[in-house]
Amino acid sequence: MRMVRLTLAKFFCALLLSLVASTTLFGQAQKYQGKPVLIIQFEPKDQPLDASELHAILPLKQGQPLRVADVRASIERLFATGRYTDIQVDAEPYTEGATQGVIVRFLTKNAWFIGSVTDAGSINNPPRAGQLENASRLELGQPFNDQKIQDAVGAQKRLLDSNGLFLGKVTPSFTYNDSFQQIDIRFEVDSGLRARFSQPVLQGDVKLDPNIILKATKFRRWLIHTWKPMTQSRVSEALDSVRSLYQRENRLEARVSLESMKYDAQTNSALPTLQIDAGPRILVNTIGAKISKGQLQHYVPIFEEHSVDDDLLLEGAHNLRDYLQSQGYFDAEVAYKPQRVVNDQATIDFIVNTGPRHKLAAIEISGNHYFNTDAIRERMYLQKASLLQFPHGRYSESLLRRDRDAIVNLYQSNGFLAVKVNSRTQENYRGKPEDLAVFLEIQEGPQSFVNTLDVEGIEHLDMKKVLGSLSSVQGQPFSEFSVAVDRDTILAQYFDKGFANATFEWNSQPSPRPNRVDLHYIIHEGQQEFVRKVLVSGLKYTRPELVNRNLTLNSGDPLSPTQITDTQRKLYDLGVFSRVDQAIQNPDGDMPDKYVLYQLDEARRYSVAFGVGAELGRIGGCNDCLDAATGAAGFYPRVSMDVARNNLWGLAHTISLRTQFSTLEQRALLNYSWPRFEDNDKLTLSFTGLFDNSKDIRTYNYTRLEGAVQLSQRLSRDITLLYRLAYRRVSVSDLKVTPFLVNILSQPDHVGIGSINLVQDRRDDPLDPHRGVYNTVDLGLAEHFFGSQRDFTRVLVRNASYYPVGRKMVLARSTEIGNISVFHYFGIPADALPLPERFFGGGDSHRGFPEYQAGPRDGLTGFPLGGDALFFNQTELRFPLIGDSIGGVLFHDMGNIYSSFDHFSFRVHQDNLQDFNYMVHAIGFGIRYKTPVGPLRVDLAYSINPPYFNGFNGTTEQLINAGPVPCPAPAGAPYQCNVQNVSHFQYFFSIGQTF
């Protein structure tokens, strides 16, 4: 008997040898050749595959004659599963009753696969634990071996060294999971003390004062001149800073690199050695046109690449030509002339011939029949001249080539395989020497169609469903683009069903019918793979059931990449994991069932955020400004601090405290959020407590205490319902109103209100919408049943819609209607609703008013009192203004706050100084500047018919002593009235569109 040992590293060599002489591998087994195999055994008994799976994949079968070829094929098949690193085959005679045969034993050594990889211990940041884990390059689910661990330890040690932690130690430890052949790796890190920089050594052709270079490195602290601790980022910033230093000296080819970093253990210091080759000074000039240095640095790539060669200079010449053409110099020519180095200086001249300045006055398109002209223009970069956005148009030869290619691709993707697009330019267009026209002539040619489509190879999917998703079907235009779309569509369906190795081939041939093509698709499905089990690791505080509820994969499901990624997204959406890694264990193994792995890193459970800001503008309600009922301009600093405890109870619940302090308002909001309430992904329950103290913002100062519970239900992708029950107590003070109203309006307000809010959002971009609708309906009921002292209903409806106008403009409109109806009240109707519950408006809702300044006012002081009804309508025409980043807005706002819905009116004239129930109109112009967080908004509004009212010209004491005497004040009164009005001009500044 002879034992054969195969290791994975020698597997392919063993196969090659087996082809030469099978007796070399199984020489002793020859004497058992042909004898029946009575028993097949595996040692150890616990195998990574079930007994049924093992016997199913083995060519060697029990009861059949022993053949060396079957043994060899069995070894190959076992290795192909990827589950083994070592296999030994042993055979010995065995007698069972009267039958003499052999026992074949497979002695196996299991493979191991990488599970979780964590770094812990004494880690001095930087680097962070996550950076060390990434440096190890140990990928989840990949085969494990000792060499990978050695490489990982070395890589982490190098990362520590690069951050000055030269004494750091990395020690790996392992946890084995025999059931899943998975090994979790933990690196215990002891960072040690961080080294500090020391005086750097400068080598090479420096050409600058070493002290200036040392200052540029910033290795040493300013003023106190002590050396900073070494980190990788500081080294990188130092090299960049030194390079910038040479750049400022016009030494564009300067080379700065870190030659070495020597560690001195006695002083715990790091000695950097910088290799510097300054190179000559290089001056870049333009001859024939004046181009700023900034433009040269932007368009000539030698400044970015820190190198000078003919390719970069030629690219710079082309870029400068395109820039000049975009400025209207359509005939511009640019060439470069490099000079030799003389006295440590080289000059590069770009010779520019701008030619006359033109304006792209027309773009004429002809020959198009299949597509209309507007559809073609939408795909073009060329733009006719417009007054502000493109004063000379947008034109260059490269843009013209790009547009021709875009039109060709458009036609070819719709079956016009022989399409041609010719272009020509015409100067002196319509007799104007400065005008230029571009003419595009399209020769469409014949359109090709699919005559027949034959699909071969679909066995495991629904043929009808697959064919229904294709675009290249009988009678449709034929193009390679459509075939590519079909390929992606078919393979996506196969991948989603676990056919990871599915392939797609196609061919075509002309049909006997003219301009018709017969298509033939060939699909090779390959082996379907399934989920053996989903393994989740990394949970410390999070409950497993929370994760399990969000798994879209289960054992036995097809191994779908779509579902794997969808689960990853859902786990991220929980908001409790900073990192979710997903992988397939043993991805290259030839097995139909595979483990899906998710390695989770829990985010920090506590988070703290600080903010600093300010408000600048006209704020209403100034205590010391009784003669300025529309407010006073000022600067109001603001700070905020938010503290949150995430993943409470391990269930993704969150409790947070958000605070804001300013000279105008002090605010604290305590919120408890329970997402996926009752295991429903569409429900979120939240509890809120609010303290809000405000002054100098409205007619009154107030202190608000509120508790609320809210249930959010997502009905569909764009519709959400909010059910809310709130109880609040609001006390007001420092009212700037007629004295006899103070006692009535300053009573503490206790309101319990239940409300339902429906939100429908179908906008294409919530930050800057161009199409779609946004609707909200808010219905509220305050009643004694909810603990409310006042009974009323509240309705607030808003509808906003957005319509593209042509290619560039957007027409946006928003209408808001609200009404509050009081019931079970037997006093004076005007005083039935407390001030804090009334509607206040202005500012963003109507730009003809400052914030909170719309609606009824006090007859003595002129300060706003709010109302029971509102109507606001805003219309904007948004259009590009300058280039692609700056847009303009023309707007019209109309509406007002009304004392009651019965007094709603569209009239535009104010009857008297006590009449505020009329429609105020405002027009204006705004600018929008695109930023990553939304457009920066500046609006200037002109109110056409602002309200006039009686104002109070006196002190607070005079107001208190005034009594119920109305304006105009009689002779000898302790105060004087003066007629005021809301200013015709208002301005607003914020981030985001108005609506």
Regions found by a protein language model. Give the residues of each.
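Bacterial N-terminal signal peptides
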Residues: K10-S22
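Repeated loop/turn-to-beta-strand initiation elements of outer-membrane beta-barrel proteins
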Residues: S578, Y606-V608, L648-I655, F677-L685, ...
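Bacterial N-terminal signal peptides that target proteins for export
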Residues: M1-C13
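C-terminal outer-membrane beta-barrel translocator/porin domains of Gram-negative envelope proteins
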Residues: D573, G589, Y595-V596, S607, ...
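Periplasmic polypeptide-binding modules associated with outer-membrane biogenesis and secretion
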Residues: V4, Q28-L626, Y636-D642, S656-W674, ...
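Transmembrane beta-strand segments that form the barrel wall of outer-membrane beta-barrel proteins
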Residues: A91, L551, I584, V608-L616, ...
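Transmembrane beta-barrel wall of Gram-negative outer-membrane proteins
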Residues: L664-P748
